[in-house]
Amino acid sequence: MDLSSAPLELLPLKGLRLGDQLLPLSASKEQAEALLGPAEEFQGDQWYYAESELRLDFDQSGRLEFIEFLGGLEGRLQPTVYALPAFQTGADELIEELTRHNDGPVDDSEQGYSYAFLNISVGVYRSILPQDVQELIAEMEENGIPTRGNPDVERDRRRAEHWETIGIGLPGYYP
């Protein structure tokens, strides 16, 4: 299946809708392979697809327990969650929507870098925060490095304002 041409919808606690087909959480490895084809790469019970932009994690009994998109804002795979484009939506807006659907405890112990929504088993991650970019700009300016129009600064600013990964797991996946 060409993942980049099918609409991809994360359905928390249920699975991944690929066009009109569903890859359910708790699917067997055989079911996953029948839908997606053979994985491009394996690391133990982790299967990777689409040049490592999609990861499937299987438990010890060979059942799908976690689905994660790893491509971020510039990736070819652009999933939706609750009708929002997960990587194109601003980080704060997505957090608000996930919090609303979660209606319960959120693990925000990573201080803005990641959140785990315990009731809906959704996790998001980014490697850089807006305040990190501001600190980088201040440091560059102190060292006489131009920041206005600097492509590295602009790239980091875009990355800080969006999520780099989003994943869904079986109920209770996040403790």
Predicted regions and their residues:
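Short helix/turn-capping signatures at newly exposed starts of structured segments
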Residues: 1-175
